[in-house]
Amino acid sequence: MPAPRPGTPVRGSTTGRPLMAAMDLFGRRWALRILWELRAGPLGARALLARCEGLSSSVLYQRLRELTASGIISPSADGYELTRLGTALGHALRPLDEWATTWAQEQEPEQEPEQEPEPEQELDDQEPTET
């Protein structure tokens, strides 16, 4: 599947809106994790595989191609690194991260108010039963 491009239909949208293309790209397995790992500096494929437990090399190379074609990362002497657009993306995602934290807190199950315990009757207050 080719990298999503603004102006063309993408999964879930035929409008070609840039936001929809970006959401399609970032919604692909491991895409955001790869970008997260590159935030501190360049990494090679082996380092990315080691940091992303469960990521297969075929999916890694597919995502690297898509992110490179989209101008978000670029090959470097040390592997792959964020471009100017990739760095700007990190800054743009901070408000979404803050929103997601608030959302997660509001998703915590509400605790039911504690109910008053039933008053216990003392044994002396009970009527005797016949046996």
Where do the PLM segments sit?
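Short beta-strand "wing" residues that participate in macromolecule-binding interfaces
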Residues: P75
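Intrinsic disorder/low-complexity segments
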Residues: A3-P6, E53-L55
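Short, flexible loop segments at the rims of nucleotide/cofactor-binding pockets, characterized by
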Residues: T8-V10
